[in-house]
Amino acid sequence: MGHLIPQTGDEETELGLAAVRLANCAAFPMVFKAAIELGVIDTLYLAARDDVTGSSSFLTPSEIAIRLPTKPSNPEAPALLDRILRLLASYSMVKCQIIDGNRVYKAEPICRYFLKDNVDEELGTLASQLIVTLDTVFLNTWGELKNVVLEGGVAFGRANGGLKLFDYISKDERLSKLFNRTGFSVAVLKKILQVYSGFEGVNVLVDVGGGVGDTLGFVTSKYPNIKGINFDLTCALTQAPSYPNVEHVAGDMFVDVPKGDAILLKRILHDWTDEDCEKILKNCWKALPENGKVIVMEVVTPDEADNRDVISNIAFDMDLLMLTQLSGGKERSRAEYVAMAANSGFPRCNFVCSAYHLWVIELTKQA
C-alpha cells in the first residue's frame, strides 16, 4: 500500500497545512527529547556505526527496545517506540523502511550531534542543550513571555520565585551538571582553531566566565606556550577538572579581571544588558596591555530576518532564549558590538571569522 498523501495543489491548502503543522509544533521537540533520554538515538547510531556491510543498520522497534540502556518493562514499548520513530522519520532524523510489512529504522547522519552517552569526542553533543532547553524549569519560563511583554519583568524570575537564572542553577546540582555540558562547544572550538590564528603570540590568555575550563583546555592543547587563566565564580569552578597550563581563579568579572595579553569572552556578553557588558569590557580594558585584545565569540544577528537562512533562525531563536532566561540578555548585531566596544574604550572592533553560528570578534585598544 502506497503513501496516503493528500492532494494539495492550491495555495490555500498549502497555507492551511502549514498552519496545522505549526499548531502541532510542540510534538517534535518533546518526542525528540524523549528519544534522546531513552537512548534511542544512541542505539540507532551505534547500530549504523558498527554495521560494516550496511545490511543490518535498520532495526525493528523490538530490536531497539531490547538494546536500550534501561530495558522497558512495558510490553507496549515496541509499539510506542514505533510511533515515536515514525515521527522522527517524518522530520528526517531517522530513516524508515518497510520490510515484510513492518517498519524498520536507521540513524541519519544528524544523529551523531545528539548522542547522550556515546559522544563523538571530535564533535561534542547537543543532547544536553536540548534536554536543558526543554526542562520543566525552562518550559515554565516560556509561559511568562506574554506577561513580560505586557507588564515587564524577567520571565525566568517570574516563573521561579524571583530567582535569577545563575542563582537558580547554583542551587540545583542536577541542572548545573546539565548546563555545564550543554552546547556544541567541541565542534565549534575545533573549527575556530582551524580558521582563527589570533591566539598565536599570546602568552597569557584569560577566559572570563570560562566555566569548567574546557575552552582553555582546547586552546592550550594547540598552543602549549599559552598560560591559561580560567576565571569564574567559585560555584562555577566546583566541577572544573585540571587542564595542562590552565589555572582556575575565582572572582567576579564585575569587580576586576586577571591581567593577560588577551582576554576571551565566549558566549558571555549575550547574557547581560548593554550597561553590564560595558562594565565587563571596561574591566577587561584595565587588565590588558596597550597592545592587548579582547576575543569575543558570539552569535551576530543579521539586520534583516530571512526565512531562508538557517543562521537567521539560530540567531533569533537564541535571542528569544536570552529574553526569557536572563534580565537584559540578548544577541546583538554588528552595529551594536561596534558601539559597545567604542563605549568601553576599544576603538577597533574587527569581525575576524566565523565557525558554524559563532563569530570571532577582536576588540583592541589601538585603532
From Swiss-Prot:
Pathway: Secondary metabolite biosynthesis. One of its GO terms (biological process) is methylation. Its EC number is 2.1.1.-. Coiled coil: none annotated. The active site is at H270 (proton acceptor). It holds the Pfam family Methyltransf_2. The keyword Oxidoreductase does not apply. InterPro entries: COMT-like, O_MeTrfase_dom, Plant_O-MeTrfase_dimerisation, SAM-dependent_MTases_sf, WH-like_DNA-bd_sf, WH_DNA-bd_sf. Belongs to the class I-like SAM-binding methyltransferase superfamily. Cation-independent O-methyltransferase family. This is Indole glucosinolate O-methyltransferase 5. The gene is IGMT5.
